[in-house]
Amino acid sequence: INDSYKQRVTSNRDMVCLISDIHYGIKTTNAISPYDSDVCKQKMDYLINKTIAFSLENDVDKLYLMILGDEISGLIHNTTRLEQREDVVSQVIEVSELLYESIVKLAKNLPFVVVGLAQGNHSRVMADKKDSLEQENFTRLIKEFLKLRLANISNVLLLENKFDESIIELNIRGYNVIGLHGQNDRLNNLSRLIEMFDKKIDYICLGHYHQSKEFENNKTEVIVNGCFSGD
């Protein structure tokens, strides 16, 4: 789509964009923040346009897009299922297409895009986590869909997770960055997570908590992304 990166004079600037907790398929009708699949698409379009504008304004070499789980509303809560506008199969198909279209739009406008996905709790196949295997997660289907659709786009790299499917590992300009959903981690006790790695972790990016915040934990900067669905 965009081969300009091959002849590009580097600016030594990279950018990270976080997406999490889309909860595609759920419908809420509260007056402050109504949400359904149409609103989701509008929000995604707004985010992608703002990302492109900021990247171009700052002459960014490479965009790292970290998709931090809960792309779909899923099956895990029966009350949530009753609020869903689409069945879970439709959720997977439609959010996969939405993410694909968003990545293509980024690729058309930016030199290079790196995409990583981490699976969350809403995308597990079984409602009860005790009955669910780690690898039985709808995010694997979303990732496979993206892999097939993006295969011939030369300036997009879809990452394979080194540790497991729940953790994205990046090295950005010498900084070690990990991204994950966060359902198994408490914000006030991230030491165990940090100690899992045999290197210094400079940044941890999380979803799950639905409220954006940023703080430091043992010299590691922790960035918690807000909830895409706004609930």
State where each predicted segment sits.
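Active-site metal-binding loops of divalent metal-dependent hydrolases
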Residues: 20-22, 69-72, 119-123, 182-184, ...
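Domain-scale recognition of functional cores that engage charged ligands
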Residues: 116, 156-157, 164
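Metal-dependent catalytic core segments for phosphate chemistry
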Residues: 23-28
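Short, solvent-exposed loop/turn elements at beta->coil junctions and helix N-caps
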Residues: 167
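Core catalytic region of metal-dependent phosphoesterases/phosphodiesterases
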Residues: 3-19, 30-148
